[in-house]
């Protein structure tokens, strides 16, 4: 490959989306939950997806990862169409997923979790322990004895050791104390700064704004809002009405 071609490809990777969704219709069996949804995320960006409970946010992630039914549309990672791929194939292609229920195994230690799905790359167990120092002291602890915050850190760490190019996180701050939430948000920002594209479902709008380069809102499976964090702040009342969730003040130390 010539130097010019290699350079051109690097430039394209910077400017082209890392992940794209085109006119997705998806749901469970014959039931359609997501309708005509499209968006794109570039490398090193975070997209926050907001909306009230039951509007299809989790179903969206389940469809992207192959756990729910895709009726039509396209799921593209880099230059590859992953729409027909299996859940395993999508993970191998670089799609990481932290589900809402965390899926931590009670009978495995922290260290054993970080061997699951491990692939060569920047993110290994040592890098995860550096990102989450609290886990380093719990290497031999079973999943059953971890706190909710520790389980969430471990779920993120387990996804990271697969060295995905795109990470999906479904409400990672749910049910956690403000102190733990602040630490998680700082960790997610570091992940984004390392060049990963992150898709974040978040019920708390202040958290969504604190992390996002871009925000979208969905209602009844359809896109009802799209804008950056500054626009979302400026249109606070309008977006609150759309998503049915109150927008609280964003802490200054968590904003860009």
Q: Where do the protein language model's features map onto the residues?
A:
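The feature captures the beta-strand-to-loop junction immediately N-terminal to the Walker
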Residues: 50-52
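Helix-to-loop junction immediately C-terminal to a conserved catalytic motif
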Residues: 65
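ABC ATPase NBD coupling module
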Residues: 69, 81-102, 125, 137-141, ...
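Conserved ABC transporter NBD signature motif
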Residues: 73-81, 93, 121-123, 127-130, ...
């Amino acid at each position: 490959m010539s130097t010019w071609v290699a350079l051109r490809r690097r430039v394209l990777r910077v400017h082209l989306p890392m992940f794209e969704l085109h006119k997705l219709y998806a749901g469970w069996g014959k039931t359609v939950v997501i309708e005509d949804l499209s968006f794109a995320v570039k490398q090193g960006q975070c997209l926050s997806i907001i909306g009230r409970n039951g509007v299809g946010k989790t179903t969206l992630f389940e469809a992207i990862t192959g756990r729910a039914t895709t009726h039509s549309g396209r799921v593209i990672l880099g230059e590859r169409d992953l729409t027909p791929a299996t859940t395993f194939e999508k993970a191998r292609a670089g799609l990481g997923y932290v589900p809402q229920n965390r899926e931590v195994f009670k009978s495995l230690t922290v260290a054993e979790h970080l061997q699951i799905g491990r692939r060569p790359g920047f993110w290994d167990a040592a890098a995860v322990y550096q990102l989450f120092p609290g886990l380093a002291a719990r290497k031999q602890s079973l999943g059953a004895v971890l706190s909710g915050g520790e389980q969430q850190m471990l779920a993120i760490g387990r996804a990271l050791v697969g060295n995905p190019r795109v990470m999906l996180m479904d409400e990672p701050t749910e049910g956690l104390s403000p102190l733990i939430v602040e630490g998680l948000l700082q960790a997610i920002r570091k992940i984004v700064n390392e060049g990963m594209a992150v898709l974040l479902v978040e019920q708390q709008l202040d958290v969504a704004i604190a992390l996002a380069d871009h925000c979208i809102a969905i209602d009844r499976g359809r896109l009802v809002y799209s804008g950056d964090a500054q626009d979302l702040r400026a249109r606070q009342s309008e977006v609150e009405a759309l998503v049915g969730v109150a927008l609280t003040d964003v802490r200054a130390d968590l904003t860009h």
